[in-house]
Amino acid sequence: MDKKLSMALVLLVFFSMLNITADFALATDSVTIRAPAVSKTSSGYIGAVLYITVSAVPGDGHIYVDTWPLTELDTQASARLAVEVAGRMTGKDVTKYDFYYVVRSESPVIGGPSAGGVMTVATIAALEGWKINNDVMMTGMINPDGTIGPVGGIIEKLDASAKLGIKKFLVPWGQTVITTQETIREENRGIIQIITKPKKVNVVDYAKKNYGIEVIELEDVNDALFYFTGKKFSEKEIKGEIQVNTDFLSEEANKSLQKNIEYHDSIEKELKSAKMGIYEKKYMERYLDTAQDFIDKAKEDMKTGEYYTSLSELFNAEIYIGVVDEYLNADDLDKRLKDLEEKINSVDSELKEKREEIKGIVSLEFLSAAEKRLKDAYDYLDQARNYVNNYDSLNAVYAIAYADKRCDTVKLWLNLSLKYSQGEKISIDDLKEDAWKRIEEAKLVYVYVSSMVGESSVSDAARSLNDALSEYEAGRYTSALFYAIESNIESSITIELSMSGDDPGVIGEKIQRARDDAKIAIQLSREEGYEPMLAECYYEYGENFEEKEDAANAFRMYKYAKEVALAYKHISNPETMPTVVTETPSVSTPLPSTPSSQGTTTSKEGSKFILILGSGLVGLFMGILIGSTFRGK
């Protein structure tokens, strides 16, 4: 009986392990794709080819990168960003997969993110089980928003790719005409000179003439997917003209306008009668003049219904008036700081108390705005203390004025949050989880971009990321989420604008795309049944900056509008999956063997290998187990 029981247990273990092994094998998808690179030799730079195998298996969100010859850290950063973008595009939860990237090359290549786009394509193909068309190769880094960023060494990469018999070569948008360095040998009166001169090259003509290859510009990963797989994700189109309306702020804007006019007149009279030096008085008058300019701008913007922009301008006006007010009346700065701290703490307590009453997405967005402004008020209070301790009275009164007026705006957004509180209550656990995911994403993008442009260029992103972490620790999860969004945006615009150079055409196209993306995000929110009021505020502000030809801030505000509109989308509709459109079949040529890639397999071969290996291990285990069972008897 004992032998029969033991044998039954052995068989149960055997079939269970075999089933697990088979399930794992069937769930394994691997894709091998080729990416052009640049290698440095004694005679200069030449093209090289990377063979990248990507596997996606059920797991816990780990990402493993195996490279040979060794490459730089940006390859790891590119892999992580590829997973992030792939998850967003496919709608799959990438934390439920482990990803393996095996990168091989016949020669050492120069570090760089130019394979990021290819890695993203391969990652999506692995997740979806799609085949790759090997008649196509591509160069281009991956941006956090899924667009393809510019790279160098395009001619060298094209030369290397041509040797593989490809038919199409994909390049980032705006890089079909590039500047290369041409080395010229000149002789003048017996003296030979080697001169390097810049030379413009039309990549389309060069590829057609020398190799018969078609060069195609890409805007984003979705475009690349079409050429590599014959499939792409359906993209939302703007349905008619998207109307942005901030009328819900009209009452607050009118109140603020009247308040600022009266405040300005009052402090102006007080300044005129104040006893101080002529230069000191003129210096204060300039603050009031600047405030008046903001008031005048706000009046004009209110005429066209731009109420959020008007409120922003009136906030600035009130700060400048407040500086003069504090300068004239704050005789005891230490006491003023104590009073201001009590005011901010009181508003903080009210916010904590009212937070429990918040219901619905719109109310939650306004709560985010209130919490973020509260953090701002505390930060400027700390700055004011430092200035007072260092006897810097002028900067101290500016920081005091800012913290005081910012505290007032916390009340404004909190009241709006309560006014529009309706619907279901949002789970704190969901908010906490969402905030942490956003922070992790912001960390990833920051590391990626800083590896490209240096940490000093993304200091604003680092500051916002630190703010996100501190707000998360304080339990203000909506504020933490928005600071994480801010960090992500700051990193993204840094890399995108820095790679655009001074080309107004490229920058204009990026702003247009950002504007359209924001419109689509607003449209999606409306289709899901709620009005993304805060996103509309940022969109309006972006239009205002665009009218002023402030490209960087317009770009920034449109990106804010998009991200804010989608910030809580998964809470209201977590199961939304993208639609796949097949437009043309993908015709694939056989892929040559990968250099030094023994053990790298395709999807089916990998599954068979894992199944055979797993079965063998199970058999070995069974033999030991059976033997020990009967020897024990």
Regions found by a protein language model. Give the residues of each.
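Long, charged/polar, soluble alpha-helical segments
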Residues: 211, 218, 222-632
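Extended interaction regions within the primary functional domain
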Residues: 13, 26-70, 561, 566-597, ...
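Short, basic-rich loop-to-helix N-cap that marks the start of a DNA-contacting helix
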Residues: 3, 22, 607-609
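Peripheral, non-AAA+ core regions of ATP-driven protein-machinery
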Residues: 25-299, 311, 328, 336, ...
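C-terminal segment of classical bacterial N-terminal signal peptides
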Residues: 16-24
